[in-house]
Amino acid sequence: MTTQAARVRKMFGSIAARYDIANHLLSCGIDFSWRERAARIVTDWHPHSVADLATGTGDLALALQKKLPDAEIAGVDFLPEMLELAKQKGLRQPVLADAMNLPFGDGSFDCVTIAFGLRNLENCAAALGEMSRVIKSNGHLLVLEFSLPTTRILRALYRFYLHRCLPLLGSSLTGEKNAYGYLGDSIEEFPSGDAMCQMMVENGFTSPTFEPLTGGIVTIYTATKQ
């Protein structure tokens, strides 16, 4: 395991038990609407099989299960602590695996989703290539990820929240300050907008789009497998 993967595993493993409540409180509950929007987009594609990578406690995978009751929805994560919580919430197909090295054959899924997980992977481009590998031709990718707001004032306020407030609030909720300090740094460093779309094109996808939500605090990216 690489140093980055070990660091991420340690951080998220330590906050697994309070991961859901912390996310909902720190986002003031808006994270529900973000996942709902993502789930509606995927539903409109009418997939028969979906792999939700970095599924965590399964929120997006569970939303897809409700909207696509006849589809096979695999929730993939490399943390057994997270998958156990996802199973307790009703995830039907948990898969313990690393998103960088998926245990699926080429073209296994109509769609791959990943919510708030891509920036945590050591090599974003390689991860996109692995996602492309397991998606069927003309299948779809959806990425839901944090980004920086588009307006100057909102961006400044958001950065203050990310770097000054969030680590303290996250620590009080989970007892783990480093995970939430890392969150702000990883959002700053992650490619967004056109840069993210270009990376998708360079790693097996066509027709990329992006849709900022909540002033650009998060962005939904979609693309089609070549």
Task: Specify the residue positions occupied by each region the protein language model found.
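C-terminal alpha-helical "lid/dimerization" subdomain adjacent to the S-adenosyl-L-methionine
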Residues: 6, 147-199, 203, 209
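Hydrophobic beta-strand segment of the Class I
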Residues: 19, 112-113
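Conserved alpha-helix/loop element of class I SAM-dependent methyltransferases that forms part
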Residues: 28-48
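A short glycine-rich, Lys/Arg-flanked "PGG" loop and its adjoining helix->strand segment in the class I
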Residues: 125-140
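Core SAM-dependent methyltransferase catalytic element
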Residues: 204-226
